Amino acid sequence: MLYIIKPFLQKLRYLLQLLLTQIVGWSAECHGSWFTRIIIKLFILFYKVNMQESLQQDIAFYKTFNAFFIRYLNKNARPINSNPSVIVQPADGIISQLGTIQDHLILQAKKHFYSLEALLAGQTRIINYFRCGNFTTIYLSPRDYHRVHMPCNGVLRQMIYVPGNLFSVNPSMVTHVPNLFARNERVICLFDSNFGLIAQILVGATIVGSIATIWSGTVMPPREKVIKCWHYPKFGDKNAVILLKGQEMGYFKLGSTVINLFRYGRIELCDHLYTNCITRVGLPLGYSNKKI
């Protein structure tokens, strides 16, 4: 009997997560005037959001909750490290894990690992690039700035949408749900760079209304059940998508996680970084083993 009930319960849980996400996403786009302002005020108070960093500090400026959530920061709020040999932190949040990829296994939490194959949806060519390389996982809490930036100069070569679950990605869930990041919906972005091929992966979660990139707009929704791939021209082509270090590359409407993958032998992660340390866009994340 259990083998019949279990798939049904899993499907029901997914549908409830999807329904909740759609309701929250719809609500966050509603133009509610006074109601929207009340929700924003309560959110700021509850999560202790630092509005002094925001480009627009008057909450009356924000016509929807999502407009507030993806607010811009002041121009000088996140200075970008200009050393060309340094890779910078792509998002505000905390480092939930970082370190070396153990052949093909990435640490999710203590005693929990997930595979490159699962995270990268079986894309064999890409998987082999990152074996034994380095990774970082940054969790964006509701209070954080939710625009994601480039860790280095890069030329976009591929974007992959991977359908999946919508588990919460808060620290408690990450500790208890096996293979969480490899099971959740996500958008994988691959860039050629002076540090070799790098991956920047935006992971969806419960109540993440959407994920968007600056070159394609909203990637999800619509939520689909098939893997979708987009390929982009290399450097030198007039249609190449070139992004500079510190430049915005996308955003979350409600919080989630950013995972970065780096090739073996191309970078060293900064010694001062550790699990649960705070990250800020533009601060050093790692550095090249060779002069750039």
UniProtKB/Swiss-Prot annotation:
- Entry note: cofactor: Binds 1 pyruvoyl group covalently per subunit.
The organism's superkingdom is given as: Bacteria
Q: Cellular location of this protein?
A: Cell membrane
**GO terms classed as biological process:** phosphatidylethanolamine biosynthetic process
Instruction: Show the catalytic activity.
Output: a 1,2-diacyl-sn-glycero-3-phospho-L-serine + H(+) = a 1,2-diacyl-sn-glycero-3-phosphoethanolamine + CO2
Please list the residues that carry the modification Pyruvic acid (Ser).
S256
Annotated active site: D92, H149, S256
Keywords in alphabetical order: Cell membrane, Decarboxylase, Lipid biosynthesis, Lipid metabolism, Lyase, Membrane, Phospholipid biosynthesis, Phospholipid metabolism, Pyruvate, Zymogen
Identify the GO cellular component terms for this protein: plasma membrane
Instruction: Give the GO molecular function terms.
Output: phosphatidylserine decarboxylase activity
Pathway(s) per entry: Phospholipid metabolism; phosphatidylethanolamine biosynthesis; phosphatidylethanolamine from CDP-diacylglycerol: step 2/2
Name where it mostly resides: membrane
Q: What is the required cofactor set for this protein? A: pyruvate
The Enzyme Commission number assigned here is: 4.1.1.65
Give the similarity note.
Answer: Belongs to the phosphatidylserine decarboxylase family. PSD-B subfamily. Prokaryotic type I sub-subfamily.
Role, per record: Catalyzes the formation of phosphatidylethanolamine (PtdEtn) from phosphatidylserine (PtdSer).
Protein name, as recorded: Phosphatidylserine decarboxylase proenzyme
